[in-house]
Structure formats: structure tokens, C-alpha cells
Regions:
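Hydrophobic alpha-helical membrane segments
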Residues: 1-221
Length: 221
């Protein structure tokens, strides 16, 4: 998808990131709203990819296609993701991860010093985050293309992730390699890596659900 219209996908990715960053800068509620809207934007990416596959040209306005789908279900999914992320942060704090509010932290060097010997906590956080993101990876597309409740979409996404664990791990590793390579040396490669990631969100969904036998397709709860 990205190779067929790289400039549009780069523009869609930039628009998504700019909106997200702008929301995060809003005091109190901005971060919450930004998190709630993430599944909506990823639904937009999936819809755009399917549209492109059908022979239609993607457009910048496609960034908001997700808002034309069952918005409440997508926002509920965002709330689930936010709750999971907060639970992970709470767990890491309980395990002893230094926090931004720690009075001993004034510089990056202070944080590195306090983190010494606790690097394993970061590994735990990375693994838990990857598990949550992976388990819910298909949910935005499921809500965009099927008449499902949020809970049912989450169940189908989890089932698909577990059933295709090897492929999910390989995809995650490949994505990590692409992002690490893109971030070096000055992050210029992310201009390509991020659009490739958002464009690929539909590919996995299509491989698992649209090529499945009819009896295996998701049905409404």
C-alpha cells in the first residue's frame, strides 16, 4: 500500500502524529482524548488500505474515515487500551521503576543512576506493552468492517493473535528492526518507517480474517 502512494501515506501518518501531539499538549484531558482516538485513526488506516486495494486513490481526508464507523465502539477500545497502559505503568512503579516525579531526578544522568540494576523492569514493561498491543492489534479493523461490539472485537483480536503467534512475533520483530534502523542516525528513516507501519495495519487483518473460511469469520455478539 505504501509503495503505491508513498506521499499520501506519509501525509496521513504526519497528520495523525500532529493531531495526537497537539491533543497531548492540552492540559488535563488532552492525553486521555489522544489515547481514546488512537483506534479511530487506525480504523481509518485500515479503511484507506482496503479502499486503495479496491483501486481507489487514497486521499488526505481518509484520515477521518474512522469517525464514520461505530465511533463509540472504537472509543471504548481506546479506553481499554488506556486502562491497560495505566495498569502497566502502575505495576512498573510498584516494581520500583523511578518516576518523573521522583525528587532525586533532576537530570537524565540522575534517572540513569537510579535505574541502574533495575533495567529488567523496563524489559517487563516492554513485554507487557507488546502483549497488549499485539492482542488488540486487529480490533480497530474488526470494528471498522464488522458489526461487532467492542468486547467481541477484542475477543476475536486476541484469538487471532494467539492463533497466529509466530507470525505476530515475526511482524513485531520486523517492525522493531525497521523502526530502530529508521531512527539512526538522525531519525530520517522514520519518515518511511511510520507510514509503512500504519499502511501495514490492514495487511495482517486481511490475511487472517478476509482469507478465512466463512465459518471462521467474526459474527456480531
Amino acid at each position: 500500500h505504501f509503495r503505491r502512494a508513498p506521499l499520501v501515506w506519509a501525509g496521513l501518518s504526519a497528520g495523525w502524529m500532529m493531531i495526537t501531539l497537539a491533543l497531548v499538549m492540552v492540559p488535563l484531558v488532552g492525553g486521555v482524548v489522544a489515547n481514546l482516538l488512537q483506534p479511530v485513526f487506525f480504523a481509518s488506516f485500515a479503511i484507506t488500505a482496503r479502499k486503495q486495494l479496491a483501486g481507489e486513490a487514497p486521499e488526505m481526508g481518509d484520515l477521518f474515515l474512522g469517525f464514520k464507523r461505530p465511533l463509540r465502539a472504537l472509543l471504548n477500545l481506546g479506553a481499554i487500551l488506556l486502562a491497560a497502559e495505566l495498569a502497566i505503568i502502575l505495576l512498573l512503579t510498584m516494581l520500583g521503576l523511578p518516576g518523573a516525579g521522583d525528587e532525586e531526578i533532576a537530570t537524565v544522568a540522575d534517572y540513569v543512576r537510579l535505574l541502574k540494576g533495575k533495567e529488567w523492569i523496563l524489559v517487563v514493561g516492554f513485554v507487557l506493552t507488546a502483549v497488549v498491543k499485539g492482542a488488540l492489534w486487529f480490533a480497530p479493523a474488526l470494528l471498522a468492517f464488522h458489526d461487532l461490539s467492542t468486547a467481541h472485537a477484542v475477543r476475536w483480536s486476541l484469538f487471532a493473535a494467539v492463533s497466529n503467534l509466530g507470525a505476530m512475533v515475526a511482524y513485531g520483530v520486523a517492525l522493531t528492526v525497521v523502526f530502530v534502523a529508521g531512527a539512526l542516525p538522525w531519525g530520517l528513516g522514520l519518515i518511511v518507517a511510520i507510514p509503512m507501519m500504519v499502511a501495514s495495519t490492514y495487511t495482517g487483518y486481511a490475511a487472517v480474517f478476509e482469507e478465512a473460511a466463512p465459518a471462521e469469520e467474526p459474527t456480531p455478539a
